[in-house]
């Protein structure tokens, strides 16, 4: 047989393999010798003819475990994973003596689909039973299978049990973490690998660089680049392109340009990476110049290049250049039917306002490319062209183009943004009729109903979802919290916590806001404790905690959270200023404002609003005037809220004439909040003459603010101005405005009970009045002791 081995190696075509096969048949070697049979099986598969491999295998009367392994391996080569697994089952049914050579190929077949993970688990069991689980190749194959099917915990168990962890094992685990979106874990594993003395190769470094790009952390990116430089890797085009993309995704375009310049032989991938980097940084003109240089250098662009260039044209409105690029693609027959570039073309025409051209593209690809439809619907929705977005949705249905989950979710979001909830309900009906159970769609429905105030409808959708992800739970949690259903939000969080459901930063953010809105201090502290244990604490949750503690009356806790923050955003500074303001600590509020400015953070409208509010709470008129005038120095123009707060400060101090003069000098018409501040000051200082003097100004106000109408009508009632009282109440009634009833809330053992006037819930009232009775008794006892 040895004389035939060079012949197998020299077979460079399917025809030559067939000729050798015929010769072996004539000589009779295929009937008794398994070696040429296995070589033929491999050769046919290598030439892309797995069916011929199968025929050779079936013709041999006594295939052994090794021959099965060869055919299984060949099926995996040819991506015939089901066939490979079927062969394995057949082998298991025929013999218990399975060669360890079989297992790596079967495990690779199982790695190709999550559906085959259960088979992979059984194969793993047989490997352990057969005592071959210490084989390095098998261990790496197990690692690969669990990693590729998303079962990272089992992959780590296999890895931890390996007596020797070589480069392949480490690289497989790092790649598995990256493929499953666990970028931080992948980088941690890479560090452990280096610390363990295992030298990474170029392939591993490319994976790590791509992970850094996804993470977007420049500090880590530079550290990895330094590792590459120290190890003196050969900076080939692939590694350079990865580094280039990494730096652009981390916001360091200058480093991307430096790496690009170092590439000696720039290919289409290099140029495309640089063009995409410019696009990512919104340097569209540089992207177009790079494309021009690429063409001049004789490098043929690919579809990815053209897609990036079209995006550049769209960003700066160069429609003529965009059409030229598309014409270039058509002339080179790169995209004859708009198939690949349809999405970029739709975005280009939409950005340039050529909506008729968008729809022309849609007509060309309508039967084939639902992505283009979705793109235009999404673009219309984001640009506020909600009617057009919904018109496209209707057009799709009319043309019998089946909307997918993205289409439905985008259309539902469009209805939400336009306040067209009835139309959103119709789409909801379509979702029910077509039995769409996609999580993205269901979450959009919860969001739409929640933001329109229909919390009951949102809750109904939520309760009908069988499998809820953390996003779904968060959508409902935020829905309750944003609509004032804070008790329900806290109850939902408790259920999540005690059911050991997955939580993330958004979960904690929503429940902290719920605790804040009803002043539930004990529950807020408990949530804070659980947040620390979970390791999910971040800038946003810290800022929410500051607000929560301040509103619940624990300023010391708010200060503790603020001081412990490693970094502070403008929202964090603003929240702390607001916290001091709520507690009348004007000196601390101003000191924090000054610290913020010294740290290099420029104050915005919200910061000044909180400073003015702090001045208002403490009655600090002179400070209020100073900071109101200071706004212009920082390029901030006072809006209606700033004026309302400043007028309130002046009015409460009794300086009503100055307040009125300020209103008249406003650069825009004063709204109900501004006039309401002046009216409230007049009520406090019993200046009905001023209210009568500004009666015409007040009657011109049209608003849906029930507080404004209630304040003014109550003043008229106190003064016996019944005609004006009736006029205002009539205006409220005709506008269908109702005063939102107030409520009280009390916290007992971390449980919050809410009640309003006329509350008849006996379970709550009994507990609440029992607690209040105890407080009354304590008060009476203290009074007796004092006397």
UniProtKB/Swiss-Prot annotation:
InterPro entries: E_motif, Pentatricopeptide_rpt, PPR_At4g14850-like_plant, TPR-like_helical_dom_sf. Residues 674-749 are annotated as: Type E motif. It is found in: Mitochondrion. The keyword Zinc-finger does not apply. PPR repeats lie at residues 33-63, 64-98, 99-134, 135-165, 166-200, 201-235, 236-266, 267-301, 302-336, 338-368, 369-403, 404-434, 438-468, 469-503, 504-534, 538-568, 569-603, 604-638, 639-669. GO terms for biological process: RNA modification. Residues 1-16 form a transit peptide. One of its GO terms (cellular component) is mitochondrion. Its main location: mitochondrion. Residues 750-780 are annotated as: Type E(+) motif. Keywords: Mitochondrion, Repeat, Transit peptide. GO terms for molecular function: RNA binding. NCBIfam families: PPR. Belongs to the PPR family. PCMP-E subfamily. This is Putative pentatricopeptide repeat-containing protein At1g69350, mitochondrial. It comes from Arabidopsis thaliana (Mouse-ear cress).
